Amino acid sequence: MKNRLRVLRAERDWTQEDLANRLGVSRQAIIAIEKEKYDPSLPLAFKVAQLFGKRIEDIFDPENEG
């Protein structure tokens, strides 16, 4: 699914490792989500939204599949 994770991360000057540590996941998971190879679980999507202060649908777009 399309997402804005890479853009939001870059706006904060965070590396993939920084974001992974903040979310409690592996860097490989962040890479896979950013490349749209992996859709995050609902709990992880909520954590991402909370971390960036946005709604899930503002970050992840299930209507616009990759």
Regions found by a protein language model. Name each.
Residues R4-R22:
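Short basic helix-loop element that most often maps to the first helix and adjoining turn
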Residues D18, A29, D58:
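Residues in the helix-turn-helix
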Residues V25-Y38:
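Recognition helix of helix-turn-helix/homeodomain-like DNA-binding domains
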Residues K37-Q50:
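Short, basic-rich loop-to-helix N-cap that marks the start of a DNA-contacting helix
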Residues Q50, F60-G66:
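Short, charged recognition helix plus adjacent turn
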